[in-house]
Amino acid sequence: MTLTAERHDTAQPENAGVFERTDFPTDTAHEQVTFFQDPATGLKAIVAIHDTTLGPALGGTRFYPYADEAAALKDVLRLSRGMTYKSAIAGVDLGGGKAVIIGDPATGKSEALLEAYARFVQTLGGRYITAGDVGTNSDDLDVMGRATDYVVGRNTSAGGSGDSAPMTALGVFQGMRAAAQAKWGTASLAGRTVGVEGTGKVGYQLIKLLLADGASVVATDVNAAALDRVARDFPEVKIASSVIGQELDVYAPCAMGATLTDESVAAITAQVICGAANNQLAHPAVEHDLGERGITWVPDYVANGGGLIQVAGERLGTSADDVRAQVEKIFATVVQILDVAKRDGILAGAAADAVAEARIAAAR
């Protein structure tokens, strides 16, 4: 069934599951929320389209074992709204959407389920374009591509743009350089110490860029294999059990979200924070604490937009060179955001939202 933000039918029992309800709250500002299920494969999925002012809604499909259907709905509503802002700030002609598949990908994922999901995506007629996210990868997207035209992020062998980690890392690097310029008067990171938390695909690529720019790097990761790879490939990198609390100029959270807590902010010595992780703030008041300490934070959805720009380019037929040039413009975007924040006496997060909202408003 398809439920829109305008629809609000008769009340249902409070313990009814999402797939058993016919009511929907009217205060989400989403254009469309669609619930899909396929009993034959066990598929239960939700697609949320937040805003299509700038173009079709783009956002990844998250395959995750949510505690219940209400938790899945809450997550997809939050994530899809975030994608609207991420697309707007990245300068791509796409809107914001997201999808979740409820279940454990380790045990519940199958080609039949992915194809069933993709057939449902196809029925949306291009209003929503899917991509990878937690629990889905390029191989899964290749499978989806058998049943829908509206998927990006596939392997190059399947006509996709391939791994987006290098472009994501480049965007973070450019955001970091812009913050450095605002903080120290120069965009160069030469002689600066950067703590990279998370040395997976994006963190690894970021370390390469930092070292090439002359920075010293301290790195940590809960994944021993990922950290071993960094130690092997970049012997000049200092390996640590934690980077928070180290003497740093820049902190780059590139792993899980919510690492910026009341406690961690009190321990951070860095004057710039810019990383690839999503949802870095444990709660909104943390950004106020960062501002009180004079720490420049680059909003995560701005810094990590390089991957989005790449997959958007795949959909729009943009050349690799043009994609790279657009990712490098994240530098100018961050400069603009920090200038707005300083001029208006607001936090960087609010300034980023204002810039994104202005672009959306101009297109209406």
UniProtKB/Swiss-Prot annotation:
Keyword Oxidoreductase annotated: yes
Catalytic reaction annotation: L-phenylalanine + NAD(+) + H2O = 3-phenylpyruvate + NH4(+) + NADH + H(+)
GO molecular function: L-leucine dehydrogenase activity; nucleotide binding; phenylalanine dehydrogenase activity
Residues that coordinate or bind NAD(+): R62, D133, S164, T168, A255, M256, A276, A277, N278
UniProt biotechnology annotation: Has been used to resolve racemic mixtures of D,L-amino acids to yield enantiomerically pure isomers for pharmacological and peptide research uses.
Residue numbers binding L-phenylalanine: K86, N278
Function: Catalyzes the reversible NAD(+)-dependent oxidative deamination of L-phenylalanine to phenylpyruvate.
Name of the protein in its database record: Phenylalanine dehydrogenase
